[in-house]
Amino acid sequence: MIEKMILRRFFSTKSSTMRAWVSENGSGVELKEVPLPVINKPGQVLLKVKAASVNPIDVDMSQGYGREFLGTWKKIESCDAAASRFPLIPGRDCTAVVESVGGDVHNLAPGDEVMAVVPVILPGTHAEFVVTDSKYCSKKPSNLSFVSAAALPYVASTAYSAFTIARVSQRNAKQQRVLIHGGAGGVGSMAIQLLKAWGCEKIVATCAKGSFDIVKQLGAIPVDYTSDQATQELIEHAPFEVILDTVDSQLAKWSDNVMGVWRNCVHVSIVSPLMREMDKNGVPLGLVTTAMKHFERSFQSHLRGRWFSYAFFRPSSDLMSQLSRFAEDGKIVPVVEQVMGFEELEKAYEKVSQLNGRGKTVIKYD
């Protein structure tokens, strides 16, 4: 009876296998035929992927990044001390057509076109089918193609997570002045657009001079991070209530100097050492060394009434509903740099690994 309730409205596909890009041991990906994922919780949905973005975290995870954390999570979840994070299917977001739904899913039905994000503990979207929680899906904006919309969910979720930590939202963004390091990249360009959609007072973004046009179009004031005058320009735009690092640089670390003093200002970085420290030292010691680095990074800020924190990609149902609405209203526009075919994914990984993109790389499945 329980099984029937969980699988209510589940419609099986014609095949029991699919093609997926798989990392077997953390040394890259290869295209394989693997079992089709199945719904095993009543709130999940099975999606037929139409397009997916490629993000630096996908490339890193295919090379073993996060193996200690994810391996430990799998052991706890499965109650199996021998469980491993491999084989791994990367990919954290997609656009798709709903193939089937669990028994508790009432807001989606087979045939619906959606945008979706997938938690890192689940097999990813660089496959023909994927399972995720229905709360991490939203209707694909009708004015966007599958390819364009696929550029939105992961970067929006990451930026939203950082702004949640910084206590910036639609309710208070109008009073905020924000500095974004890496404004032309995937997360940076989305962060600018979220802030503009929320009515943020002032946004300054560092980027290469060749990306000034993109940053200006999105609604931010560009500053060339390679210029000798970069620090002086930031001082002229200061003070900032919030700083977001989407890249790691000396300028990003220095920019604590342009935050407001004794105003509870926040510096957030999505470039966290946590996963690498755990991969290097194991989970317990990795947590300790990360905490030490966090303390070292934030101590001086606390002395002046400011604080520092790391942020991570975290799926959010609240964000997904906002994202669809903003995209349909034209307040958020996908920034797609390059589109490649499903069988070109290794080439896409190589491109994204260079970390010099002006927008997103998207994989089109058919």
Curated annotation (Swiss-Prot):
Keyword vocabulary terms for this entry: Mitochondrion, Oxidoreductase, Stress response, Transit peptide
Family annotation (Gene3D superfamilies): Medium-chain alcohol dehydrogenases, catalytic domain, NAD(P)-binding Rossmann-like Domain
Disulfide bonds: none
Subcellular locations according to the entry: Mitochondrion
Entry EC no(s): 1.-.-.-
One Pfam family, short name: ADH_N
InterPro entries cross-referenced by the UniProt entry: ADH-like_N, GroES-like_sf, NAD(P)-bd_dom_sf, PKS_ER, RTN4I1, YIM1/Zinc_Alcohol_DH_Fams
Tissue-by-tissue expression: Expressed in pharynx, muscles and intestine.
Disruption phenotype: Under hyperoxic conditions or low temperature (16 degrees Celsius), lifespan, body size and fertility are severely reduced and sexual maturity and egg hatching are delayed. Slight increase in the number of apoptotic cells at the embryonic comma stage. Also shows strong susceptibility to UV irradiation and paraquat treatment. Does not show increased sensitivity to X-ray radiation. Increased sensitivity to P.aeruginosa PA14-mediated killing. Body wall muscle mitochondria appear enlarged and abnormal with less developed cristae in hypoxic or hyperoxic conditions.
Targeting signal (transit peptide) range: 1-20
Biological process per Gene Ontology, one example term: innate immune response
Enzyme class, UniProt record, top EC level: oxidoreductase
Primary site of residence: mitochondrion
One term of GO molecular function: NADPH dehydrogenase (quinone) activity
GO cellular component, one term: mitochondrial matrix
Stated role: Plays a role in oxygen metabolism in the mitochondria by regulating the levels of reactive oxygen species (ROS) thereby conferring resistance to oxidative stress. Involved in resistance to P.aeruginosa PA14 infection. Regulates lifespan.
Family, per entry: Belongs to the zinc-containing alcohol dehydrogenase family. Quinone oxidoreductase subfamily.
Protein name as annotated: Reticulon-4-interacting protein 1, mitochondrial
Organism: Caenorhabditis elegans
Name of the encoding gene: rad-8
